Design a protein with these regions (language model features):
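Class I S-adenosyl-L-methionine
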Residues: 3, 10, 39-42, 46, ...
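Short beta-strand elements in bilobed, periplasmic/extracellular small-molecule ligand-binding domains
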Residues: 21-24, 42-62
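Hydrophobic alpha-helical
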Residues: 41, 56-112
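Paired acidic/hydrophobic, glycine-rich loop segments that form the ligand-binding mouth/hinge
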Residues: 78, 122-124
Length: 179
């Protein structure tokens, strides 16, 4: 998912991020998923000249917005989970990110709202159903055999932009977000 976010940022700037800066935010900085997303994103942008100015990992939900507002100005805020995308979106909507563009991973109606209002540029939506199904499948396999090694699997995702938010293809995704 982090790689997908990096690809979208690179597409928007034709691969040229020289002289641009970013901050990365994740609600749970110590989780395995956050680590993979961070590594995937950084692999995608590491040779582009993009400067990482700050990271905000493992913050408390209620204080996330205050921390975001206190960070130095950047060109982009990359949010690696839904809670972070919502916090960054709310700050951007209130003009409290000093013009930073938000690129995030999320699966809530609030994240979609910030995309719709222009507070976020891009939303990568993980297929949570598939992730849950794969997780349960691996758990059952592990119960059947003590020698079974859990495999890491890629979770499918959808990239949504403001202009494609209400497309026919995304209607089902929006419906499941609202449930």
């Amino acid at each position: 998912l982090g790689e997908a976010l990096a690809e979208e940022l690179l597409k928007d700037y034709s691969g040229s991020l020289e002289g641009k800066s970013l901050g990365i935010v994740a609600e749970s900085g110590s989780s395995y998923a956050s680590g993979l997303r961070m590594a995937g994103f950084w692999n995608g942008v590491s040779r582009t000249g993009l400067e990482l100015r700050w990271t905000m990992l493992g913050y408390a939900r209620e204080s996330g917005q205050e921390f975001l507002e206190s960070k130095p100005q950047v060109d982009f805020v990359v949010a690696l989970d839904d809670a972070s995308t919502r916090a960054a979106g709310q700050c951007a909507a209130g003009g409290r990110l000093q013009g930073a563009l938000v690129y995030g991973i999320g699966n809530s109606t609030e994240a979609a709202y910030y995309l719709d209002t222009g507070a976020a540029e891009c939303l990568v939506v993980p297929d949570s159903f598939q992730a849950g199904y794969q997780s349960l499948t691996e758990t059952v396999r592990g119960m059947d055999s003590y020698l079974h090694q859990v495999e890491s699997r890629q979770v499918s995702h959808t990239v949504i932009r403001r202009d494609t938010l209400f497309s026919r293809e995304n209607q089902e995704i929006l419906f499941t977000m609202s449930q």
